[in-house]
Amino acid sequence: MFTMKKPLLLLFFLATINLSLCEQERNAEEERRDEPDERNAEVEKRFLPIVGKLLSGLFGK
C-alpha cells in the first residue's frame, strides 16, 4: 500500500503544477487578446442596462 502512495502523490503534485501553469498561460493569452476597444464595449454593455433601468424607474415607465 505504501509503495502505491508515493507515485500517486507524485502524479497528483505534477498534475497540480501542470494545471497551474496552463491556467497562467491561458490568463496571459486572454490579457493579450483583450484590446482597449473590446474592454470599453464590455463596460458599455454592462452600463447601458443599468442606466435604462434607472431612467425607466425615474420616469415611471
Curated annotation (Swiss-Prot):
Residues 1-22 form the signal peptide. Pfam families: FSAP_sig_propep (PF03032). InterPro entries: Frog_antimicrobial_propeptide (IPR004275). One of its GO terms (cellular component) is extracellular region. Keywords: Amphibian defense peptide, Antibiotic, Antimicrobial, Cleavage on pair of basic residues, Cytolysis, Fungicide, Hemolysis, Secreted, Signal. Residues 23-44 form a propeptide. It is found in: Secreted. It comes from the Eukaryota. Expressed by the skin glands. GO terms for biological process: defense response to bacterium; defense response to fungus; killing of cells of another organism. Antimicrobial peptide active against a variety of Gram-positive bacterial strains but not against Gram-negative bacteria. Has weak antifungal activity against a slime mold isolate. Has weak hemolytic activity against human erythrocytes. Belongs to the frog skin active peptide (FSAP) family. Temporin subfamily. This is Temporin-CG3. It comes from Amolops chunganensis.
